[in-house]
Amino acid sequence: MKSRPLVGQRLARFIGVLTSLILLTSLASCGGGSGAGGAALAPIVVNSLVDEASPSGDTVTLRSAIASASSGQRITFDPSLDGGTIDLTIVGEAHTVLTGEVMGFDTPNNISFLVGYFDRDYGRSALFATKNLFIDASDLASGITLNWSGVEPARVLAVDGDLTLNNVAITGGNSVFDAAADIGQHPDDDQTSTLARGAGVAVWGVARLSDCTIYDNHALGDSQDTSRDGGAYGGGVYADTVVMENCIVSGNTVAGGGAAGGGVFVVGGRDTGLSVSSIS
C-alpha cells in the first residue's frame, strides 16, 4: 500500500519528461522556436556602388542583394562604400502593381465611397521588393545614398511588405501619372493613369526609418483630375504606417488635382519613434 504514492510520483515525472521531450522535438522541427524560422541568416554585404542586376564574380550590388535576400534578411555595406552614392539607372518595375483602394461615386448624392481594394498600377519603381526588406548602413559613419538618376521618372524604392531602413539617404525619386496597365478587376476601376504615390519610398506595410534623410523627391498627379486617383500623395514617403527616429525629410513635393503629404503621407497612422525627426 505504501508503494502506490511512489509509483504515482515516478509516473508523473515520466510523463513530464516525455512531454518536455516532445515539446523540444517540435520546436526543433520548427526551427528552434526563434519566431523567424530558425537562426538569423547572415547579412548580405553589398560591395559595389554600381547599379547592376547580375554582377559578375564576387561583386554584390544593392539590386542583386535585394533580389537574392530572404524576407527580412539584413543587407549591409562594405566599409569601403562609406559615404558613397548608388546612382540607380534601371527601372526595376515599369508597372508596380500593388493593392490599393478603388473609389466609386454616388452622383445623385455627390459623394464618393470605397468600393474595395484591388490591384492598382503605381507606375515605375527603380527598386521593388515583394517581401520584408532590411537595408542597414548603420555601420557606416556617413551612411549610403540611393539616388534615382535614370532617364524616365521613377520612385526610388517600393516595398510590398515591411521596410527597415537605417542610415540611408533617398533622393531623386519621381512618381508621376502616366499610362497605366490594364489590370482592372472591378467595373468601378477605370484606372487610366498610374498613381503618384511615394516618390522616394512607397511601402505597403510598416516603414521603419532610422537616421535617414529623405530629400528632393517629387510626386506629380494629374492637374486636370480632382479624384483621388488623379492626386499625388507622399512626395518623400508613402506607407501604411511610419516609424521614424532621427530622420530628416526635406525638399519633397506633391502636386496634382488633389495632393497631400509633401514629405510623408501615412495611410494608417504615424509613430515618430523614440526621438524627434524633422519634416519640412
For each predicted feature, which ranges?
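Short glycine/acidic-rich loop motifs that flank beta-strands on beta-rich extracellular proteins
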Residues: 149-154, 174-181, 218-226, 253-260
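Glycine-rich beta-solenoid repeat tracts in large extracellular/virion proteins
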Residues: 103, 113-116, 124-129, 155-160, ...
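N-terminal secretory signal peptides that target proteins for export/translocation
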Residues: 1-11
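N-terminal, post-signal-peptide segments of secreted/periplasmic proteins
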Residues: 30-197
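Bacterial N-terminal signal peptides
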Residues: 15-26
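Right-handed parallel beta-helix
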Residues: 141-143, 164-174, 206-221, 241-253, ...
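Ser/Thr-rich, Pro/Gly/Ala-heavy low-complexity intrinsically disordered linkers and tails
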Residues: 35-39, 210, 234
